[in-house]
Each structure stands twice: as C-alpha cells, then as structure tokens.
Amino acid sequence: MSSHQQKQPCTAPPQLHEQQVKQPCQPPPPEPCVSQVKTPCDTKVPEPCHPKAPEPCHPKAPEPCHPKAPEPCHPKAPEPCHPKAPEPCHPKAPEPCHPKAPEPCHPKAPEPCHPKVPEPCLPKAPEPCQPIVPEPCPSTVTPILAQQKTKQK
C-alpha cells in the first residue's frame, strides 16, 4: 500500500512522462541510506576528540600567559616613554615650524605670480594692435608732407 502512495505524489506534480518520474524516484532511496550511515560515524569520532583536545589546551596556555606578560609590560614601558618623548617634541617642532613655513610661503608665491601673469599679458595684446593701426596712418601723412613740400617750393 505504501508503494502505491509514493508513486502517486511523484507522478502528479512533475507532469512529465511516467517513465522519467519513476526512474529518479527509485535511485534516491539507496543514496540517502549510504550517507546516513556515514554521518553518524563522522559525528561520533570528531565529537569526543575536538572538545577534549582544545578545551584543556586553550585555558591552560593563554590564561597564564596573557595576565603575566601584558600586565607588567604595559605600565613600565608606556609610562616613561609617553611623557619624555611627546612633551619635548610637540612644543619644539610645531611652534617654530608653523610660523616659519606658512608665513614666507604665502607672500612669496601669490605676490610674484599674480603681477607676472597679468602684466605681460596686457602689454602683449595692445602692442601688436598698435603697429597695425599706425601703418595706414603714415600713408595718409605722406600726402600732407608732399603738399607742405610743394608749398615751400
């Protein structure tokens, strides 16, 4: 009776050929049986080994090492180092550096740069324009000079 019930739900949902549905339904049962036998074996072997080995090792090694090494080292090394090194370094380095570096840099860079760029640009533009305009002017002046010369004669 149970075999009939299994075939009905398998053939109903897929709507594929009955032969194709029957084939995949039959091979799966033996596969899970093999994996089920392997899983209990794997879990039984590692379970007792893992908890027994790491549990006693971790608490015994790190517990005594951490409190003994860092406790005496931290208070002895950082206490004398911090006040001796940073105290004399901070006031000596930043004080003379700040006024010397930014003060001369600001006036030297912007002052010469601004007047040099706009000054040569302005005279360069009108210069070529002036010689072009006066060229036709001399031609108009020549006839005037000729008239003056004729009058003098």
Swiss-Prot record:
Tissue: Expressed in fetal periderm, hair follicles and in the thickened epidermis of the lip and footpad. Also present in the epithelia of various tissues such as the penis, vagina, forestomach, tongue and esophagus.
The protein, known as: Cornifin-B
GO BP: keratinization; regulation of cell shape
Organism for this UniProt entry: Mus musculus
Sequence segments annotated as region (14 X 8 AA approximate tandem repeats): 27-138
Subcellular location field: Cytoplasm
Annotated region (Disordered), positions in chain: 1-35, 49-85
Transmembrane segments: none
Domain of life, per lineage: Eukaryota
Cysteine pairs bridged by disulfides in the record: none
Gene this chain is encoded by: Sprr1b
Ranges for the Sequence repeats: 27-34, 35-42, 43-50, 51-58, 59-66, 67-74, 75-82, 83-90, 91-98, 99-106, 107-114, 115-122, 123-130, 131-138
